Amino acid sequence: MMVSSLKAAAVVAGLIHTILAAIIGTTTTTPGTAVPTLTISTAVASPSASLGATLPSQAPLPPSQGWCIGQIFCAGSLLQTVNVAQVYSDPKTFVDKPTSKSSQQVLADFSNFNLSTVTEGQIVNFVDSDFLGEGLELEAAALTNFNPTPAFLNNVTDPLSKAFAQTVHGYWTQLARNTNQSAICDEYPGGTCESSLIPLNHTFIIPGGRFREQYYWDSYWIIQGLIQSELYETVNATLQNFMDEIEGFGFIPNGGRIYYLNRSQPPLFIHMVYDYVNVTGDTSILQRALPLAEAELAWWANNRTIEVASPYTNQTYMMAHYAVNNTAPRPESYLTDYLTIHDPTLSTPLTDNQAAELYSELASGAETGWDYSSRFEAIPQLGNPGLRSLNVKNNIPICLNSILYKARILLAELYGTSNATASSTHLQVAAGIRAGILDLLWDPAKLAFYDFNLTSNARNDIFTAATFYPVWNGIIPNEILASQSNAFGYFAAVNLVVNKYNGTVPVTFIDWTGLQWDAPNSWPPLQYIIMQALRTIPSNLTTNGLPTPSSGQSTYDLVPAGQLALTEAQLPGQPLLGAQANQNATATGPAADINKLSGTVVNGGNATAGEGWRDTLQREMANRYYASVLCSWHATGGSIPGLLPQLPASELNLTNSIGNTGNMFEKFSNLNIDSSGYGGEYTVQAGFGWTNGVLLWVASTYGEQLVAPQCPPLVAASTTTSTSAAVGLQASSGAVITAVMMAFMAHAFLL
């Protein structure tokens, strides 16, 4: 029989391992003055069947991928067999394990198996015998210039908020890594071992959890925090690593593993260089950075840019899209992709061409950084089953084109008068991108940006937080500049969130799809982008206070007509607390704005006299983000001596956090600020680089406006979500696909 889905036991074992692996052992010396003791965790095999069971039959192997060299960590018989055996609950675990033998010996050992009779136990023994611990190629790094009390802390007036910022500042010492030169394998195929790691020459900060290597777009928000922490050498080192990758590969890959070499991530390298130079005044880096920035932009222009004709104006533009050349499962998510393609419940299996195209779409979805979201599905409400309708390559995304526009603007500024010709060229290209964004992606009636869908030759109608990318990057449509009312209308959904929900702004308002880039999840980078977009609005458009809904209406009625493409009743519900637990707030009308009433938690800070609407929303966003991070950290064992005692064991037991000292999560719930986010292909990760970076930026930027948050009691929180959901331990539903949905999707396959 064909392998079908992850077994519950494997998922539970993987969840337990993930929580244990999230706790990094360190010494107790002054942060940064000594190398922390890094505990390399080795996952315990948790196969989906008994060790004596024969492996399920396999689908035919996908084509070999020219961009991925090797037969162990790239698509092939060995990788597919280990994944079909489901040795680990997270497919990334295996591909992060260096071999303990030469490539030839590992392949020879594997060739001894008869794949029609091989058992789970034989594969487990093979992996245990021929592979070492995941992440062994990295070692903890000392941050020699670490300052325990950076100047930004003086901006924070609330004692608890200040102490928490200082605590988070100290986490950099636990996330700093170097390549462990003694554990590096020689270049394939020679040497005594093989590894998937791309060795880097300089210190870097990892996101945390399963993300053991340097990542591209994560590093932008990590750098925002490192700058506040005055760790400028670490910022420089991060940029040097990226420049090494551009020199070696012609682009910056998604992350520091060979299995990422067919795709990039949102191209924020030039943004990072600009911020570093702007803060430090170190222009010496530009001698190397400018030519390599040109090379990266050329890669995006040559590999990800197409001509698009506007149905609105008949003008033609060169616009970028995410489009990865790939015809096999992603090695780090092999089983997930394999099951998406080869589900036995399909009444009509995909053809080879359809499978190859969907593999390309799955990889392209990962390149967006939003892996995955209903934003890129042809049938958004289907959630995980809808991954079969992924239409990433046929969308012209708001985010990517906005970033590339600003990259050209920043590069022109970095050139200045030293190369007027290059500067002028980039400004000209930027003007073309800007015109395309305003024509194709901006809806002047709805006062929002939407991705342009090449399949329908029209804008999508799904409202996402990506709408704020253009203004963050300096593209402000004339309609926004026309009046305070219009400027507010662009941010009206943010106002709705701070009135209707307890947390921060979700990715979309499409909820419980099982996809991690949908509601109720809210992500640190998006909160940063929204706050920066608010800061970009000219002050003459922000003097009025927040508008008030008319009698009988709610803040939903302040949102421009059609902007959300959902009725008020279709928006996600906000669970109530206390005596009203186990029910949601009223869905429509004035009572839907629960933060003006009782039965909820308000964490918006304190208003000041004469505060305009822009500043009110910034204050609300800053405090809510701080509350989400601090409360979920406290709920998982975090404490601050003299200010915030650790929760009793009876409450920590609700979050499986006894013995833990607080987790910094990668994503949060906008419904429950005690909780991490939900869903996705892997369990929620702790660490966490970009969460820390955004929090330190918020502390530095809004420190005087921060107040100690009100965290809802965990007992109440546990009545509105499952125990696992309370800490974000909701297993991926990517492999749990119903026959009805799959049969429908096979019929409706649109790619």
Question: Model-derived features: where do they sit?
Answer:
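Short amphipathic alpha-helical coiled-coil/interface segments
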Residues: 293-296, 423-441, 618-626
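Alpha-helical solenoid scaffolds that mediate protein-protein interactions
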Residues: 242, 276, 300, 411, ...
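Active-site core of glycosidic bond-cleaving carbohydrate-active enzymes
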Residues: 209-221, 229, 391-417, 421-424, ...
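N-terminal signal peptide
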Residues: 3, 13-36, 723, 745-751
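Cleavable C-terminal sorting propeptides in eukaryotic secreted/cell-surface proteins
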Residues: 725-751
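Extended glycan-interaction surfaces of carbohydrate-active proteins
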Residues: 50, 55-59, 63, 67-68, ...
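Aromatic/His-enriched, Gly/Pro-containing loop or helix-boundary segments
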Residues: 245-289
